[in-house]
Amino acid sequence: MFSLQDLCRKHLFILPDVFGEHVLQRLGLYWRCHGSLQRIGDDHILIRRDLILSTNEALRMAGEEGNNEVVKLLLLWKGNLHYAVIGALQGDQYDLIHKYENQIGDFHFILPLIQDANTFEKCHALERFCGVSCLLKHATKYNMLPILQKYQEELSMRAYLHETLFELACLWQRYDVLKWIEQTMHVYDLKIMFNIAISKRDLTMYSLGYIFLFDRGNTEATLLTQHLEKTAAKGLLHFVLETLKYGGNIDTVLTQAVKYNHRKLLDYFLRQLPRKHIEKLLLLAVQEKASKKTLNLLLSHLNYSVKRIKKLLRYVIEYESTLVIKILLKKRVNLIDAMLEKMVRYFSATKVRTIMDELSISPERVIKMAIQKMRTDIVIHTSYVWEDDLERLTRLKNMVYTIKYEHGKKMLIKVMHGIYKNLLYGEREKVMFHLAKLYVAQNAATQFRDICKDCYKLDVARFKPRFKQLILDCLEIVTKNLAIVSWKS
């Protein structure tokens, strides 16, 4: 519980002019050898009505003098007890520290506030169960190089601490400590330094690591390649450039940049590359299914003109990566026909169907190309895009008249007849008369005989007129065809 006097002191911001030294002393608002104390806001005080100090700096001074009364007052004014402890350590006022020991708890929390190495070590010594190793770790953490230098001899006898402190210095980015450890003690492996520098995007530490390596005369090609792969995979341009100062292959960088879609990295190097090299990167981008922006960047450096069309199409089909074709189509570079020709010739019906869907190519276009290449499997598989069998037959029937080659027409008619034979008998009745006339017109005798057998099985009473008309129509078609053949000969 606060006394009434404490409540007054805590909330009194303006001292009346009539308050003399005696009254101020009785109120506890007087600091011996300094003068009156007055609170200003939450974090400053006024001494003798003319000197402004931060509350924490005043606490440090009071702690150094061992003046507990002033310390208690400043703590009422929201001061930080840690500064009183720092001051007490500087003035060797251990009695004051012991009064607040229970409130402080862990003295490690005070260490970040200390600038002086001697005070730092004194503060750490207050932690009874901590030894030299703990002190050195905290000295590394808070960049207290003088403490490390003081214990250099002891450090030299504890080899295991070298690596530990070096790693901690990397984690906390203490460059002076890193330099000192490298100069005075042997750290076998610098990999941890590079890994942390990359993960923290710390170019200063990364560059320092290469200085250490260079001083050791160790810049192995494998190490440079590893660093280029890591930094390029993360798109760290400045790290890549730093590594390349010491060697390494730019192809490693470009491969990673394409693979992970780092356009800033790519753009920096593309301007320096010959066209052939960029075309190779485009093929890699297709293989890795790179993003639209990455493909556009590579194509823009080629002015959207690709000379190695055959190889590009092979990659597009092999890796089922059609985005580059879509981009070129928008730029009015039409590679669909060339790609279809390769695709239908070399790849499975399933893969052809997948690419057809991706590029929104019409089924008729694919089927016509498949007919040219005599790929019956692709014709059949592609025709399944029309789920209704009767629609499939209608679509294929319409295509027969657009095909120029006799072998192509025969193949398509065979496919159509196969579809017809798989129809239910009731559905066959709907198309058999139309197909029979088509077969006659296209001189498909085998299919015509087969369909006539089906016609004989029909109910004579119902279908006799239609069958009679079919015979007449077929005779007319044959007559016309014979006349055309005679005229041509």
Curated annotation (Swiss-Prot):
Induction, as annotated: Expressed in the late phase of the viral replicative cycle.
Domain of life from the UniProt record: Viruses
SUPFAM superfamilies for this protein: Pseudo ankyrin repeat-like
DNA repair in keyword set: no
Keyword Signal: no
Pfam families, per the entry: DUF249
InterPro entries according to UniProt: MGF_505 (IPR004858)
Keywords recorded for this protein, A-Z: Late protein
Protein family: Belongs to the asfivirus MGF 505 family.
Function description: Plays a role in virus cell tropism, and may be required for efficient virus replication in macrophages.
Protein's recorded name: Protein MGF 505-2R
Lineage summary: Viruses, Varidnaviria, Bamfordvirae, Nucleocytoviricota, Pokkesviricetes
